[in-house]
A protein has these predicted regions:
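Small-residue-biased structural context
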Residues: 1-239
Length: 239
């Protein structure tokens, strides 16, 4: 089977195909990871925020739309998708840990290196194995339909790490609205805070912390953990 990285949009079912959309996001991620190299301080935080806002909605839409299809369509679909769900879980846990570390903490470097490594592993697994398998058992029309569903969910999905939430429906789907609202309010507050100074910036950063704490409380609602595999379960102690 040919990796989707080596196929054209036409071969992937057209630009609206879920495979073409995935490939475009992966290209964007690769560029951001290259930009991340050698950054420090506020510049590193800005690049990381762009990575988070790309990666987390992307993964949420995969877990809600694509992986259930693969589990139904492929005899080994459960094992294939579970491996990627475990990678997604590790990304959530690494980002949560990274956000708690001070910029000059010696642990930050190794955590960041591992995050980049897992993100690249995830892309390779999807492009070289999962998506060619999906392509082999799915019509072009279905790939396009999945692309529309995936894009809709991606646009309303949470934008931050939530390691306690299930990586599978229905828990992750139930979590989408409350966590997305909190995450996007936090994104907006932090974006303005970075352009502000003095009392205004302090108030906005305080608002961001309140929104973060609220999201962590929402994560622990039992309904949001329904459907999860035990191997991707988090106690939330790092949050």
């Amino acid at each position: 089977m040919t990796s989707i990285a080596e196929q054209t949009d036409a071969e992937l079912g057209g630009r609206v195909s879920v495979l073409a959309r995935q490939k475009r996001d992966h290209v964007k991620l690769d560029r951001l990871l290259q930009q991340l190299e050698g950054t420090h301080g506020q510049e590193q935080e800005r690049v990381l925020l762009r990575i988070y806002r790309l990666v987390f909605p992307h993964a949420f839409a995969e877990e809600s739309v694509l992986w259930p299809v693969m589990r139904r369509a492929l005899p080994d679909g459960h094992a294939l998708t579970l491996e990627v769900e475990q990678e997604h879980q590790e990304v959530n846990e690494l980002v949560t840990r990274l956000e708690r570390l001070d910029p000059d903490d010696p642990e930050r470097g190794p955590v960041l290196e591992r995050l980049v490594e897992v993100l690249r592993e995830d892309v390779r697994d999807e492009e070289d194995e999962l998506f060619p398998r999906l392509q082999a058992v799915t019509t072009t029309a279905e790939l396009r339909r999945l692309g529309v569903y995936w894009e809709v969910l991606r646009r309303i999905a949470p934008t931050r790490a939530h390691p306690v939430v299930a990586r599978r429906p229905p828990g992750n789907v139930i979590s989408a609205l409350p966590l997305s609202v909190l995450d996007r309010l936090r994104d907006a507050a932090e974006a303005v805070a970075r352009r502000s100074s003095g009392d205004v910036a302090d108030r906005l950063w305080a608002a961001s912390r309140v929104l973060t704490a609220a999201a962590h409380r929402v994560e622990r609602f039992p309904l949001l953990r329904i459907g999860e595999d035990p191997s991707t379960r988090s106690t939330g102690s790092a949050a």
